[in-house]
Swiss-Prot record:
Gene3D superfamilies: Ribosomal protein L14. Part of the 50S ribosomal subunit. Signal peptide: none annotated. This is Large ribosomal subunit protein uL14c. It comes from the Eukaryota. The gene is rpl14. Belongs to the universal ribosomal protein uL14 family. It comes from Saccharum officinarum (Sugarcane). Keywords: Chloroplast, Plastid, Ribonucleoprotein, Ribosomal protein, RNA-binding, rRNA-binding.
Amino acid sequence: MIQPQTLLNVADNSGARKLMCIRVIGAAGNQRYARIGDVIIAVIKDAVPQMPLERSEVIRAVIVRTRKEFKGDDGIIIRYDDNAAVIIDQKGNPKGTRVFGAVAEELRELNYTKIVSLAPEVL
């Protein structure tokens, strides 16, 4: 569960390393916590030098991994080692060209097929 002030890792090669959630938009409107597949507004806390994204820039991101366990559609409980997000644009397309680490299969059902196709592993 991601809420405002939560620090997240960035799971793509867009240039940012760490994000801090400042607002949860969610998939279904105004929510208190973000889960896998929800959209958040975040600020970049750490970035790679000489990249398009810089520190203190406000961006949109979709949650791809959470430490809080969740039950999949088939009943399996999945829990990841970190909280991670992929930076997206206004249309929902990822800004990076690679995605690092595993992502949840629920992203495919939420029409984030580009993120799923870039990921090396889908759980």
